């Protein structure tokens, strides 16, 4: 799963996770020579991004970084992206199986 594959803390936008996903399916769209070094960490641990859907807050990434990247894309890889896609597809499959198994009208 994501937690096991993604090494970076606060990997929010265009970092290790998203870049790995793109490398796996459209490697031609990633110019690895232009990937910036990690430049941003949240100043307060309470602000850290935890990928939990219960509570989200937003910001303009360009207010936080010069590049708009929040994460460390230098740790991205095609192989990691392939594993992330496989894990995501498996999660989606399980969710769909749950929906299919729900009988209607509800008992």
What are these regions (language model features)?
Residues 1-107:
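Extended, histidine- and acidic-residue-enriched regions that form the cofactor-binding/catalytic faces
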